[in-house]
Amino acid sequence: MIEEEITLKIPKSIVNQIDELIKEGYFSSRDEFVRYAVRESLTEIAISKKMSREECKKIWEEYKIRKKDIKIDEKEIEELLDEVDKEWKKWKKLKLK
């Protein structure tokens, strides 16, 4: 694999957190952490591109229109979707920090 060197400026508080993870044995170096974080971010973006929340909502709305022959507890599904939505919002807040 061809590698390219880049320079990053990261707040000291984040560097301290990275260093703590290295001390705890999660990563062997800052480089390893940054490569991991970049791969994880690219994976998350790729997944979200494949199916956004809006696409999920469209699928749900279409299902509600076509559900005539399906016996299913709609209230239970809506509660589950509400839970997923709450978790999504929590996750997004964590990612923005």
Curated annotation (Swiss-Prot):
It holds the Pfam family RHH_8. GO terms for biological process: regulation of DNA-templated transcription. Transmembrane segments: none annotated. Coiled coil: none annotated. It comes from the Archaea. PANTHER family: BLL4998 PROTEIN (PTHR36215:SF1). This is Uncharacterized protein MJ1679. It comes from Methanocaldococcus jannaschii (strain ATCC 43067 / DSM 2661 / JAL-1 / JCM 10045 / NBRC 100440) (Methanococcus jannaschii).
